[in-house]
């Protein structure tokens, strides 16, 4: 089986290509620098698969949220996410009309990747971002990484692989359209030698526009003091309503937090939203909940969350810090099919599949928020138990003294 392997390197300026690249008959080496991004894409054909469902697996390290994304990258949700439209719902997945989903902070790729994937990949979840699509006829694995100052990356064709490399710089771009230029190199299948590299250019419209490429961003924070009912504050006072656009907030909440749909009125809410059950009684049922809220421009928006009772611990501290990563997005219908022609973006499962194909997503903020939740300590169990029994005993004695003491006094009163 032939694997198609595409490598893309993006530099800041045209002169960087010549200064940071060298080659011979079989190998090409690129050198890193400030803001240099390396993308690898593997495309594997599937034959004889009986599974007709689609699955998307994404991973983005939380530290990556603070990094300025390039125009060949897509804004993914932080953490590990799996989306599937299979009729068989796996354990702990939540469902909506379009897909089933799972979200976690743990990179657990081997559990969800099909067994036929054997590329000897060196997974690096601490530094790399992954976007994987599993379809009935093919599997696509996309890996993003920074190529840092002084770091080198050498590319050469391996057996049964069709290799193509593009080395680009950003020629021009605005908030939606991108024009990149550079060179494209191919390797011959028979002897593994490089063909002559050709000049090339690409013009496309971005599906996801990173917040660092937007002219305006919004502040996103938790109202202080946080308490048991934390309030997310989204400041859109400097924004105006746009035609065919919606300001949205996308939330993936762990079990320790939940939305009261009768109080907050989300646009969409899937997963665990029970108002009474503690966190530990839901662990085997679902990972949490996913929701989308519509926000109003020109004002301060507020979304109230609620905390669940969590399982007591043994000397692990009196509070559990729960983290989540809200995404504030401006979703717009463009009426333009250029989005589908973007060579670095393919619309897949996830919240974007709930919108039309011509929708672009302008990311205004994505911030990690922390909620401290009080946690009982089992070492205090005896103290609490004995204290409760003592209070109960005193209460019983007091009640009996009042009832029987008053009756005795009344009987001892002498009537004239």
UniProtKB/Swiss-Prot annotation:
It is found in: Endoplasmic reticulum membrane. Keywords: Endoplasmic reticulum, Glycoprotein, GPI-anchor biosynthesis, Membrane, Transmembrane, Transmembrane helix. It holds the Pfam family PIG-X. It comes from the Eukaryota. Pathway: Glycolipid biosynthesis; glycosylphosphatidylinositol-anchor biosynthesis. InterPro entries: Pbn1, PIG-X/PBN1. Glycans are attached at residues 24, 85, 120, 212, 365. The keyword Transmembrane helix applies. GO terms for biological process: ERAD pathway; fungal-type cell wall organization; GPI anchor biosynthetic process; protein mannosylation; protein processing. The chain crosses the membrane at residues 386-405. It is a single-pass type III membrane protein. One of its GO terms (cellular component) is endoplasmic reticulum membrane. N-glycosylated. Residues 406-416 are cytoplasmic. Residues 1-385 are lumenal. Belongs to the PIGX family. Required for proper folding and/or the stability of a subset of proteins in the endoplasmic reticulum. Aids the autocatalytic processing of PRB1. Component of glycosylphosphatidylinositol-mannosyltransferase 1 which transfers the first of the 4 mannoses in the GPI-anchor precursors during GPI-anchor biosynthesis. Probably acts by stabilizing the mannosyltransferase GPI14. PANTHER family: PROTEIN PBN1. Present with 4930 molecules/cell in log phase SD medium. This is Protein PBN1. It comes from Saccharomyces cerevisiae (strain ATCC 204508 / S288c) (Baker's yeast). The gene is PBN1.
């Amino acid at each position: 089986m032939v694997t198609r392997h595409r490598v893309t390197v993006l530099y800041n300026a045209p002169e960087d290509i010549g200064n940071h690249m060298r080659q011979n008959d079989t190998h090409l080496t690129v050198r890193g620098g400030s803001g240099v991004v390396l993308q690898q894409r593997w495309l594997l054909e599937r034959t004889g698969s009986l599974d007709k469902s689609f699955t998307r697996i994404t991973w983005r390290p939380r530290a990556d949220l603070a990094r300025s994304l390039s125009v060949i990258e897509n804004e993914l949700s932080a953490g590990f996410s799996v989306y599937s439209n299979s009729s068989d719902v796996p354990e702990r997945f939540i469902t909506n009309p379009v897909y089933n989903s799972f979200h976690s902070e743990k990179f657990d790729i081997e559990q969800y990747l099909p067994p036929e994937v054997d590329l000897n990949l060196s997974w690096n979840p601490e530094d790399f971002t992954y976007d994987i699509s599993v379809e009935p006829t093919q599997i696509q694995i996309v890996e993003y990484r920074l190529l840092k100052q002084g770091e080198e990356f050498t590319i050469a064709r391996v057996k049964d692989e069709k290799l193509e490399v593009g080395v680009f710089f950003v020629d021009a771009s605005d908030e939606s359209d991108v024009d990149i230029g550079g060179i494209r190199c191919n390797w011959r299948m028979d002897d593994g030698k490089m063909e002559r590299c050709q000049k090339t250019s690409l013009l496309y419209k971005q599906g996801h526009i990173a917040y660092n490429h937007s002219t305006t961003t919004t502040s996103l924070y938790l109202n202080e003091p946080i308490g048991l009912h934390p309030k997310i504050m989204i400041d859109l006072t400097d924004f105006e309503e746009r035609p065919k656009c919606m300001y949205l907030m996308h939330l993936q909440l762990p079990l320790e937090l939940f939305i009261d749909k009768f109080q907050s009125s989300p646009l969409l809410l899937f997963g665990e939203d029970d108002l009474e059950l503690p966190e530990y009684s839901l662990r085997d049922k679902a990972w949490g909940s996913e929701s989308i809220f519509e926000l109003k421009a020109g004002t301060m928006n507020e979304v109230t969350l609620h905390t669940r009772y969590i399982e007591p611990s043994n000397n692990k501290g009196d509070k559990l810090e729960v983290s989540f990563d809200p995404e504030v997005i401006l979703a717009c219908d463009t009426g333009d099919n250029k989005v589908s022609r973007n060579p670095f973006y393919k619309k897949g499962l996830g919240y974007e599949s709930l919108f039309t194909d011509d929708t672009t997503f302008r990311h205004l903020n994505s911030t990690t928020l922390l909620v401290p939740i009080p946690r009982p300590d089992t070492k205090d169990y005896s103290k609490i138990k004995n204290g409760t029994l003592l209070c109960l005993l005193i209460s019983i004695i007091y009640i009996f003294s009042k009832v029987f003491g008053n009756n005795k006094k009344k009987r001892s009163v002498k009537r004239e």
